[in-house]
């Protein structure tokens, strides 16, 4: 397969939530392009 025929797409990564006993529970929904974060959607609050 050549690189001309390859289709590259972003992928979504769920990061968190961290430990429930930690202060300021945070969950991030990250849209990644390789190792680069294209978009980050924070979800702050309770589990």
From Swiss-Prot:
It is found in: Mitochondrion inner membrane. Transmembrane segments: none annotated. Keywords: Electron transport, Membrane, Mitochondrion, Mitochondrion inner membrane, NAD, Oxidoreductase, Respiratory chain, Translocase, Transport, Ubiquinone. It is a peripheral membrane protein. GO terms for molecular function: NADH dehydrogenase (ubiquinone) activity. GO terms for cellular component: mitochondrial inner membrane. It catalyses: a ubiquinone + NADH + 5 H(+)(in) = a ubiquinol + NAD(+) + 4 H(+)(out). Its EC number is 7.1.1.2. Core subunit of the mitochondrial membrane respiratory chain NADH dehydrogenase (Complex I) that is believed to belong to the minimal assembly required for catalysis. Complex I functions in the transfer of electrons from NADH to the respiratory chain. The immediate electron acceptor for the enzyme is believed to be ubiquinone. Component of the iron-sulfur (IP) fragment of the enzyme. Belongs to the complex I 49 kDa subunit family. Complex I is composed of about 45 different subunits. This is a component of the iron-sulfur (IP) fragment of the enzyme. This is NADH dehydrogenase [ubiquinone] iron-sulfur protein 2. It comes from Solanum tuberosum. The lineage of its organism: Eukaryota, Viridiplantae, Streptophyta, Embryophyta, Tracheophyta. The gene is NAD7.
């Amino acid at each position: 397969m050549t690189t001309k025929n390859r289709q590259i797409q972003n992928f979504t990564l769920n990061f968190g939530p961290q430990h429930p006993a930690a202060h300021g529970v945070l969950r991030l929904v990250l849209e990644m392009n390789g190792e680069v974060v294209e978009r980050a959607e924070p979800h702050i609050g309770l589990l």
